Structures are given as structure tokens and as C-alpha cells.
């Protein structure tokens, strides 16, 4: 299992700082530009990266991320080409933690074990699958087994309306970090959920999972700073999607 995320969070915890973990789609608009974007993000202070693999039916994404995926796909983006961009990035950035974010079809089609190993070989540290339900991970252990065998973290998502019982279940599954949604629904809107982030973070702390990373795809990037203070080990921001 890679230790890049663990080492990053340990350093940040000592300084009581949150991580800046931006999200971008790989191969948008093409592999060369995509690689340059990753280089620029790290040079501009990104502590880690969440990298999307474009999909034709991004059910959880808003218009900006969907348009990004469409551009990449129109120029021939495939999972293999995306992993090649990551592989090239890794040659010059061996210490930057990277989580791949993609939809379940892109993992299931080649086979869970085959994909997980390919992702690890390309240099990924973690995989986040937004449409992989907690119940499926519990019923089909192949998902977690394949990730562990490849040396990858399989990150779990905590929705803002999660009950205490559900938070505990998710905390028992997640690896690497815990992805805390800041709102219910399609990303890129600016509507707060009814559940205060502080309550979810307290529940996570009681369950003692991996560090929470609060996802902020809000039109207001300043919201990430506030969440970082509530979840000091990790916080992230992405452009409105």
C-alpha cells in the first residue's frame, strides 16, 4: 500500500493545515495539455491531486465537469490514455499523492482486478468511485480485495445527510482518506445541505477513519478555507462543475 497520502496528512497535521487537492479530468482537452495542467497545479501549491477519467454519462457531475469530459472524449480520451498521462506525470513527481476518480463502468468493464493493477502501475495511490455503493462493497468484497492486492486505497464517500450508523459503516470501509461531500446532489451548485459539516466531522472523528477530505465544488472557493478549519487534516476545492 502506498504511503503518499498518509505521509502528506501527517505533515499537515503537524502544521494544522488543510491540503489543497484540486480535481481535473485527465486528457482534457488532450494528453499534452493535460500533463501541462498537472505540472502547473503542483507548481502552484497543490498538495495532492484528484484526477478524473472522462466518462460519457457522468451522472454526478455538473455542466463544467461534463463539458471537460466531452472535450477529452471528443479528442480520443480513453482510460488507457489517461493512465499514460498519469504515468508520465509520475516520472517527475514521485511524491505527489494521486487519487483517480471515475465511474463504476470504467472499472467493471475491463475487470476490477485488471483495472486496479493498471491504475497502480501508472502511479495512482487511491481510487474513488462515486457510484459504487457502500452496500455493494460490503456484499462484493472483490472491490476492496482488488484494491489491496494492487496496493491502492479505495476511498469511500460520506454524504452530508449520513446517519451516525452509516458514518460508522463507511468509516470501516474507507482507505487513504474519507471523501466528505459538502452538499447533496449534482456538484457545482451552491446549495448547502441541511446537515452541518461539523456534525459529520465529529462523527468521523469518533469512528476514527482516515482523514476527512471535504469536497467543495462550489462557485465560491473561499468555502474551502472554512471547511479546512473544521477538518484540519485535509480539504479540497474544485472549480464549479
Give the label of every model feature segment.
Residues 179-182, 188-234, 240:
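Active-site/ligand-binding-proximal alpha/beta "capping" segment
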Residues 2-12, 31, 56-67, 74-89, ...:
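Active-site-adjacent beta->alpha loops and helix N-cap segments on the catalytic face
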Residues 92-133:
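Hydrophobic alpha-helical segments and helix pairs
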Residues 31-43, 162-173, 208-209, 218-235:
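Catalytic cores of alpha/beta
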Residues 46-56, 125-136, 178-189, 230-241:
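Glycine-rich phosphate-binding active-site loops on the catalytic face of alpha/beta enzymes
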Residues 22, 41, 49-52, 119, ...:
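Conserved, mostly hydrophobic/aromatic
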Residues 20-24, 49-51, 98-102, 127-129, ...:
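Hydrophobic faces of well-ordered beta-strands that scaffold small-molecule active sites
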Residues 10-14, 43, 87-94, 120-121, ...:
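Acidic (Asp/Glu)-rich catalytic clusters
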Amino acid at each position: 500500500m502506498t504511503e503518499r497520502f498518509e505521509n502528506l496528512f501527517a505533515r499537515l497535521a503537524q502544521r494544522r493545515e488543510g491540503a489543497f487537492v484540486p480535481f481535473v479530468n485527465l486528457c482534457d482537452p488532450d494528453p499534452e495539455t493535460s500533463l501541462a495542467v498537472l505540472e502547473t497545479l503542483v507548481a502552484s501549491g497543490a498538495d495532492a491531486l484528484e484526477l478524473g477519467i472522462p466518462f460519457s454519462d457522468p451522472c454526478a457531475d455538473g455542466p463544467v465537469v461534463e463539458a471537460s469530459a466531452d472535450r477529452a472524449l471528443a479528442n480520443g480520451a480513453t482510460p488507457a490514455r489517461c493512465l499514460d498521462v498519469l504515468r508520465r506525470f509520475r516520472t517527475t513527481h514521485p511524491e505527489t499523492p494521486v487519487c483517480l476518480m471515475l465511474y463504476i463502468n470504467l472499472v467493471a468493464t475491463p475487470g476490477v482486478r485488471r483495472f486496479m493493477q493498471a491504475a497502480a502501475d501508472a502511479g495512482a495511490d487511491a481510487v474513488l468511485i462515486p457510484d459504487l455503493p457502500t452496500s455493494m462493497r460490503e456484499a462484493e468484497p472483490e472491490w476492496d480485495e482488488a484494491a489491496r492486492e494492487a496496493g491502492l486505497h479505495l476511498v469511500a464517500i460520506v454524504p452530508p445527510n449520513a446517519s451516525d450508523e452509516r458514518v460508522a459503516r463507511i468509516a470501516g470501509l474507507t482507505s487513504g482518506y474519507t471523501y466528505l461531500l459538502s452538499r447533496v446532489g449534482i456538484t457545482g451548485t451552491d446549495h448547502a445541505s441541511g446537515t452541518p459539516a461539523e456534525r459529520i466531522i465529529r462523527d468521523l472523528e469518533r469512528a476514527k477513519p482516515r482523514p476527512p477530505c471535504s469536497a467543495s465544488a462550489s462557485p465560491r472557493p473561499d468555502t474551502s478555507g472554512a471547511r479546512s478549519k473544521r477538518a484540519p487534516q485535509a480539504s479540497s476545492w474544485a472549480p464549479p462543475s
